[in-house]
Amino acid sequence: MEVLYSLSKTLKDARDKIVEGTLYSNVSDLIQQFNQMIVTMNGNDFQTGGIGNLPVRNWTFDFGLLGTTLLNLDANYVENARTIIEYFIDFIDNVCMDEMARESQRNGVAPQSEALRKLAGIKFKRINFDNSSEYIENWNLQNRRQRTGFVFHKPNIFPYSASFTLNRSQPMHDNLMGTMWLNAGSEIQVAGFDYSCAINAPANIQQFEHIVQLRRALTTATITLLPDAERFSFPRVINSADGATTWFFNPVILRPNNVEVEFLLNGQIINTYQARFGTIIARNFDAIRLLFQLMRPPNMTPAVNALFPQAQPFQHHATVGLTLRIESAVCESVLADANETLLANVTAVRQEYAIPVGPVFPPGMNWTELITNYSPSREDNLQRVFTVASIRSMLIK
């Protein structure tokens, strides 16, 4: 994997800097590095593809070295270099696609394609020029079963979940109380509602709770907490739990009271915040508990009082909500990130070449299914293919 990264970094630099008119002295170190790459690769044969519709391709390396010059690089020099660069880039692209198409239930973090396994040989170690990539560093740590630390912005840590729980119900569905939520990606939105606006609740206050269990622990998370859940702020028709009927939800938004958010690790509270909105920090957690209240307004204007009558029918439904959004966090496991294209790149390659469903990844790389059942085998394979995708992205956009 380190060799693949070093090859890609060298080729990217060569493509960007070996251009007509450039002083040789400005790129002499790069050209020496480029020549070292050619010397190491010459005389070797590789094969890629042969899975799904990814075609089998054979690669032979037998290139001359780039020479020295006292002057600027001329058109012939650059054209010769470009021919070599384009062949190498095509090779790297196919090695990456071959690797992204493969998976293994055992030691899935290790190279799976024939070409990348060959590049892991001792003879290619001299190509290791630059291993500064975060993904390469963490791939090395994971390969040795040591602690990794990926920094994610907008991490897709929450599997998609959209549902409701009714704490008070009846066949007519005309006086309901409960919670509804939407968890997805890096965001939780939860709403508590009471058709009667807590008229019969103790002290006219309804208590709500929403707990979300993470599939992997996060650390040093920057989080935004807002006293609103905009996705539940408009009328809608909702299917009943048994699917036998539908019920009408017509929210009128109130501000939540006594809001508390707890971040837990292995059942122990690590951080807790009360009545604090905006940016908050969570040190280390694998579960989130949101607690909040709906309080019937003690004083109401006639217009508000008309919204919340003392008895049925209840045409408007008192609702309070919260939004919790993870802006950035560190995770020991690799995750999809809304700010990165790695999952999209891997999925696109596997779809384009009709890669058959293997023993590890779900059909279509369905992220909700993948993260819901995030096994060590999936974690290993995902770290490998994401690392390869990050390498490929240096050369192929």
From Swiss-Prot:
Ca(2+) binds at residues 266, 286. InterPro entries: Capsid_hemagglutn, Rotavirus_A/C_VP6, Virus_capsid_a-hlx_vir. It is found in: Virion. The N-terminus is blocked. SUPFAM superfamilies: A virus capsid protein alpha-helical domain (SSF48345), Viral protein domain (SSF49818). Zn(2+) binds at residue 153. The keyword Protein biosynthesis does not apply. This is Intermediate capsid protein VP6. It comes from Rotavirus A (strain RVA/Human/United States/Wa/1974/G1P1A[8]) (RV-A).
